[in-house]
């Protein structure tokens, strides 16, 4: 981290599958803001996956680890794909995204869900349902069933196999992610919906009690509601505009955010950031990445949607670089490109022209130039 200047160092890790393709476009966007808007960014590219494994025996080589350690933020592409079979499980696990989340204690994952009017006809949900949809799902990311021990698969005395996992949470693990939700809600519409399954799970009983206690003690000015996860999934599809900030545990957040992606038209549209605890100066380690996976079926074809990665840059501009005007500018440019008909295959209507990954990046860059030009005309 740069402790003596305002310059932000960003480690750019394309990863696997479509990761490098979409990250190439968000890299171009960051460079535009550095060159044209004076954003104080140093970009440092690094490798992850099969290629560095074949060269070094590690999917996460030492120079990539060094780049991420020194970075204020990480721009991540994707992990996984057929090539994972060429990497031994132990090596893959040692450099997994789960291990990175744990290493940097990236406990709060923020996933904005915004329904763009330009995509109303291509989204799976009805246009009337999508009107005014703009909320954020905050997923606890470093605890819960994905990290709980004991876990495993064993053979029982009668020959049957049994798989088991452990779901567990502590007061501090719940309260710190709930605090993130309440603080964010204060900057938005002032509403938090906490999602659990407290009617059957003890971890959810504790979750609800701790979220409620924190609310009563420090955030009584924020409206708090609770939903069971099954009802929350239904409400996201039925009336997503009712939500402002939703906070939930790891596994529920994983599922609900993919469900909510349909309000945006495609997983390819969704950005995210995973935040660590603030240091004494209030700075937080942050990993920015699109929500989509590595999509090995289309990797290398140049047709992936880069907007989830590009909009992750908008989140970076707002959260890490503290440049909300530039974040809004980028979001407006994406809106402008979409309104002009720019579409990759995943968001294109039948018969519509389909842009390549590179062409969509070009469309956003052209829109940035136009938006800035109009701002100067009216200055």
Curated annotation (Swiss-Prot):
Output the InterPro entries linked to this UniProt entry. IsoCit/isopropylmalate_DH_CS, IsoPropMal-DH-like_dom, Isopropylmalate_DH
CC cofactor note: Binds 1 Mg(2+) or Mn(2+) ion per subunit.
For the keyword Amino-acid biosynthesis, the answer is yes
- Would I find RNA-binding among this entry's keywords? no
| One CC-aspect GO term | cytosol
PANTHER family, alphabetized: 3-ISOPROPYLMALATE DEHYDROGENASE
Task: Give the protein name, as stated in the record.
Answer: 3-isopropylmalate dehydrogenase 1
Q: Taxonomic lineage per UniProt?
A: Bacteria, Pseudomonadati, Pseudomonadota, Alphaproteobacteria, Hyphomicrobiales
Gene behind this protein: leuB1
């Amino acid at each position: 981290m740069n402790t003596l200047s305002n310059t932000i160092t960003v480690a750019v890790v394309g990863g696997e599958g479509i990761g490098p393709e979409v990250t190439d476009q968000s890299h171009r966007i960051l460079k535009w803001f550095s060159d044209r808007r004076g954003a104080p960014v140093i970009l440092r590219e690094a490798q992850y996956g099969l290629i560095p494994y074949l060269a070094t025996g590690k999917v996460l080589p030492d120079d990539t680890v060094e780049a991420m350690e020194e970075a204020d933020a990480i721009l991540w592409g994707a992990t996984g794909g057929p090539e994972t079979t060429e990497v031994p499980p132990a090596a893959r696990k040692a450099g997994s995204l789960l291990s990175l989340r744990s290493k940097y204690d990236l406990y709060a994952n923020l996933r904005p869900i915004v329904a763009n009017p330009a995509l109303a006809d291509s989204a799976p949900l009805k246009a009337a349902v999508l009107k005014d949809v703009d909320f954020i799902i905050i997923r606890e990311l470093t605890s819960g069933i994905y990290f709980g021990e004991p876990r495993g698969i064993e053979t029982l005395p009668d020959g049957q196999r049994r798989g088991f996992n452990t779901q567990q949470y502590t007061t501090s693990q719940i309260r710190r992610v709930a605090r993130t939700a309440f603080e964010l809600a204060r900057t938005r519409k002032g509403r938090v919906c906490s999602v659990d399954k407290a009617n059957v799970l003890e971890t959810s009983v504790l979750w609800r009690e701790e979220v409620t206690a924190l609310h009563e003690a420090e955030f009584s000015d924020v409206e708090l509601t609770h939903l069971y996860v099954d009802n929350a999934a239904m409400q996201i599809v039925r009336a997503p505009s009712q939500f402002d900030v939703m906070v939930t545990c790891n596994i529920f957040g994983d599922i609900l955010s993919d469900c909510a992606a349909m309000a945006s038209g495609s997983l390819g549209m969704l950005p995210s950031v995973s935040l660590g605890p603030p240091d004494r100066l209030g700075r937080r380690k942050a990993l920015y990445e699109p929500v989509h996976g590595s999509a090995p079926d289309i990797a290398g074809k140049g047709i992936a949607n880069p907007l989830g990665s590009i909009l992750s840059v908008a989140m970076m501009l707002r959260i890490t670089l503290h440049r909300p005007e530039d974040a809004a500018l980028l979001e407006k440019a994406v809106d402008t490109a979409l309104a002009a008909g720019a579409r990759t295959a995943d968001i294109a209507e039948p018969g519509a022209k389909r842009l390549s990954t590179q062409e969509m990046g070009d469309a956003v860059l052209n829109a940035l130039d136009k938006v800035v030009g109009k701002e100067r005309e009216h200055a």
